[in-house]
């Protein structure tokens, strides 16, 4: 999995950048998304507030904003076309590779780690996995969706070794 990471805050350590890369690759493997691409931008509460207002019409900062990328291709392609034109198949695969972008508030992660009584590393891992699942179609609007998403999220974090303690 290719992950572009940008730290707009200048506060994210190399260890956290490495952990974020690793846990997202781990989550991608667990969900069958290894051949995908995404971006992660670490932001301040101020920037998170701006983004939350712009994308969600919510006037406050938030911990993670997930922007799922859903490309629309306005052409019909059948299997014969793909067999006759392997370059078309490759182009379509590349077209579908980018899955989205996460904006993680470093300030909120610190606040929440303290509030929930676990490490900053755990909170950053949690936010990365939570956002990753959102850009891959998981949600928590209904009790059933919540059980599925939160169950998978906890399974990934625990298997990776980021527990609440």
Swiss-Prot record:
Cofactor: Zn(2+)
Gene (name only): ybeY
Keywords (A to Z) from UniProt: Cytoplasm, Endonuclease, Hydrolase, Metal-binding, Nuclease, Ribosome biogenesis, rRNA processing, Zinc
The family this protein is said to belong to: Belongs to the endoribonuclease YbeY family.
Gene3D superfamilies: Metalloproteases ('zincins'), catalytic domain
Cofactor annotation comment: Binds 1 zinc ion.
Example of a GO cellular component annotation carried by this entry: cytoplasm
Species per Swiss-Prot/TrEMBL record: Streptococcus sanguinis (strain SK36)
PANTHER family named in the record: ENDORIBONUCLEASE YBEY, CHLOROPLASTIC (PTHR46986:SF1)
PROSITE patterns, alphabetized: UPF0054
GO biological process: rRNA processing
Binding, Zn(2+): 130, 134, 140
Record carries keyword Zinc: yes
Localisation per UniProt entry: Cytoplasm
Protein name as catalogued: Endoribonuclease YbeY
């Amino acid at each position: 999995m290719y992950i572009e990471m940008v730290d707009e805050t200048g506060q994210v350590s190399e260890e956290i950048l490495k952990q974020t890369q690793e846990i997202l690759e781990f989550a991608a493997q667990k969900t069958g998304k290894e051949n995908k691409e995404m971006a992660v931008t670490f932001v301040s509460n101020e920037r998170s507030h701006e983004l939350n207002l712009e994308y969600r019409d919510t006037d406050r900062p938030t911990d993670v904003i997930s922007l799922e990328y859903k490309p629309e291709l306005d052409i019909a392609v059948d299997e014969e076309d793909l067999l006759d034109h392997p370059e078309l198949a490759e182009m379509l695969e590349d077209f579908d590779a980018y899955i989205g972008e996460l904006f993680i508030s470093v300030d909120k992660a610190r606040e929440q780690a303290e509030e929930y009584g676990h490490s900053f590393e755990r909170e950053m891992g949690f936010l990365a996995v939570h956002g990753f699942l959102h850009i891959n179609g998981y949600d928590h609007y209904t009790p059933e969706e919540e059980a599925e998403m939160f169950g998978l999220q906890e399974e990934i974090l625990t298997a990776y070794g980021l527990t609440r303690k």
